[in-house]
Amino acid sequence: MAQRIKQINKWTGSILICTAFLLIIGACNNQSELSESMLEKGVSKELADWRKENLSHLYYQLFFSIPENRKEAVTGSVTIQVDKAEDVPLVIDFRADKKQILSISVNGKKKPEYQFINEHIILPSQILKDGKNEIHIDFIAGNQSLNRNDEFLYTLLVPDRARTLFPCFDQPNLKAEYTLALEIPQSWTAVSNTLVYSDLPKNDKRVIQFMPTEPLSTYLFSFVAAQFQKETRTNNGRTISAYHRETDLKKLNQLSTIFHQVFSALDWLEEYTDIPYPFAKYDFVILPGFQYGGMEH
């Protein structure tokens, strides 16, 4: 009899293990075809194609708090609005340590179920809605693409480094509209892809809010914050500003020539392509020790 009970207990344990295994498999199946290669580090072509097919109408609302001491972390938040297809999860890229994810909410619900695997935040379909979803993530920004100096900071997100800075869908063919707010030291100013909407004091800092961008790929999103000098010129109704930290008078005297070349280049491009300049503004930033001769953002 004791032997019989022992055998029944063994079978029961096996059934429970099998049931648990089936539940795990079922949960995986609900993730709608997420293959192993799709969850590799980086963004595989398979993942990029799958997201392009299943996601649309992307919008990022971003905030970064930039301390004056470059040894202190840059903290941030992102609210992602995205339409998704029926019964599919979301795979959001974030090349950082899991401890840099401070909090997540999904459609207003805090502390949702999620996984963090190989630089991907995976939100299961069960906690999402078919159609429009809103994801809010508080995080510590990665430093890899934050080029920080004691008196300035600039992002450089090419070719695939946006995900080192903030959680996003880091592939060029998922363009999105961005709004950005920066909390920076009072003596600094900031430049981004679009015009400034507001600039307000906040204790010993200032908060600069920028207008929404046109649809952009993640690698083109950019901002610079520094103790800048600003020079502005207008030509044929077009106004351009230059931001710099130069004190050498000989170099500063070259600004007029630089402005002339920029205005001429834009006029030539419009004439050659027969396409008006499509963005809200054009500015340029001159930085010491920049890695490349120039970079468009």
Predicted regions mapped to residue ranges:
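N-terminal, polar/Ser/Thr-rich
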Residues: A27-T75, N147-E151, P172
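Beta-strand-rich interaction surfaces with strong enrichment in secreted/lumenal proteins
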Residues: F64-S65, I80, K111-P112, L123-I127, ...
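Hydrophobic helix-coil surface modules that form long, contiguous segments used
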Residues: G76, Q171-H297
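Surface-exposed beta-strand/loop patches in extracellular or lumenal glycoproteins
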Residues: Q81-K98, D170, Y178-P185
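A surface-exposed beta-strand-loop module
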Residues: R95-L153, D204
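Surface-exposed, acidic/Ser/Thr-rich flexible loop segments
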Residues: Q126-W188
